[in-house]
Amino acid sequence: LANQLNSCDDELNPKNQNGIVAFDTSSFENTILGGQTGMTISYFDGKGVTLSSPLPNPLVSASQNIKVKIENPINPSCFAERVLPLKVIPLPNVDLNENGSYSELVCTNIIGYTVTLNAGVSGSSASTYTYKWYLDGVEIPNETKSTIVVGKAGLYSVDVSNSNNCF
């Protein structure tokens, strides 16, 4: 049976994260059966409520443990049960404006003027994330910290990701 299934709570606007995502269940039954045929699969949520079999694809869900029961219909005493953990991983907590973005005005008509841009990570240590900075959509080489000093006009953006590659 499959290990824990992780999915990032990656709403277009991170302010809309709600802990519910669409899990791809298209390969669940093939993975569970591992080539066996003629078996019956039953699914139960954390409260023991029977779920549809096969599971809907996608399965829209919050983090939960789904119990899977595989049974031989010819010999009902021959069965196996496993727990399939579904985990929704929140995105990094970044301070954003009401439009779901972070913006800062940089005046570049002053020679030698620079400004420090901050990735806006809040709620956790900035060192627990990885950063990729971009200027006009092109990755800036070797800029991997939570702040960047800039003096060139353009649109700066940053991808902030956690250890699960959610960004």
Each language-model region and where it sits:
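Proline- and Ser/Thr-rich low-complexity, intrinsically disordered segments
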Residues: 1-167
